[in-house]
Amino acid sequence: MKKIFCTVMFALAMSAGVSAENAANSTAGTATDKAVANKYVPTEGNLAARSHFQDSKFGIFLHWGLYSMLATGEWTMTNNNLNYKEYAKLAGGFYPSKFSAREWVSAIKASGAKYICFTTRHHEGFSMFHTKYSDYNIVDASPFKRDIVKELADECHRQGIGLHFYYSHIDWGREDAPLGRTGLGTGRPKEAQNWDSYYQFMNSQLTELLTNYGEVNAIWFDGWWDQDINPSFDWRLPEQYALIHKLQPSCLIGNNHHSQPFDGEDFQMFERDLPGENTAGLSGQAISKLPLETCETMNGMWGYKITDQNYKSTKTLIHYLVNAAGRNANLLMNIGPQPDGCLPEVAVERLKEMGEWMKVYGETIYGTRGGLVAPHDWGVTTQKDNRLFVHILNLQDRSLFLPIGSKKVRKAVDFATRKAVKTQKCDGGVLISLDEVPTDVDKVIEIQL
């Protein structure tokens, strides 16, 4: 009877798909002329940085700019057709008196996150750092007169947290920026567009960011999709990517273009979806062989929105992190800081609670790759050397079949308690028997192969 049960379970498990490791290393579809063409050759340092990035597994995204003052999200300028000259006046009142880079980085580090990605300049066009190439920045245009990016970069380096810079290819406030499908109601004159001027401006700012702020682990681009209505538009990415890799060869480049990676990119990102899913309609691209990252918000918006108190539970956030790791991806979880410079109280509490969980189970996340067993409805697996970590997130039974083929299980224990777990060899895998139906946020079984 047990053999029949195991055989049935093996068939069901195999029908669910291939392993997460194989899925993460596969490609599908026909490459376009802009897809990876093997022209870019990363340095050894860059390859090492990619591996370190994959080991990190968990980062925090911070969307902060003038839009926080209006408390209606980071797209409020275009969503409400705010005139670019009137919007710019917000800078004169931006004074985040409670901002403390030390408190931010400390709270984020306590969560178990290994890196921070900060919006140096979002679509609104306001630079959160002191730039020579525009007066529209935190030091020259606001009474605050402090370089937010500098303080944050210094604190990240001090506390050993990785530093990633978000940089938008869009600017709803610059007259020379190309008009795309967003920001059309901000009043910018069409005749003022000057792509060469705007492109040079962006490269000049990127040079500042990669020269004046110490080691930068990644540049996170956004906005390519603003010109998807104009297929002939050339963002001149190869030249821009080459500049970045020249200034800091180990700096990783990712682009939120919702397509397969382009030549010169070092990791692939997915927005509001896990790799292989497309519930939000933004992540239909095939999974590449590059390191993977999925970004999601802790509540509903990226930037601060006063009415958005729909924060995900700690359990949901942990499950998102675990599901990402089981699909060979990092999780970049977003928080929108308040206009006074504080991280929202609920967000800080979530960070603390995630950190408590990571203190116990971090070993099953950090440094792992997608496991031997593909993701299932019950959960996922992660793997490190000969150790397979079975993350049981949703199981209404005391038994679980793992399709690991002919691999021999040398030992199986409850990761947290180190108590032995019963296993039975079956056709095509092994059957795990638990003492009771798991009710933990994440029941982790460690299997030594």
Whereabouts are the PLM-identified features?
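General helical structural elements
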Residues: 6-7, 276
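Mature catalytic domains of secreted/periplasmic carbohydrate-active enzymes
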Residues: 21-449
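Positively charged n-region of N-terminal signal peptides that target proteins for export
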Residues: 1-4, 108
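Bacterial N-terminal signal peptides
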Residues: 7-16
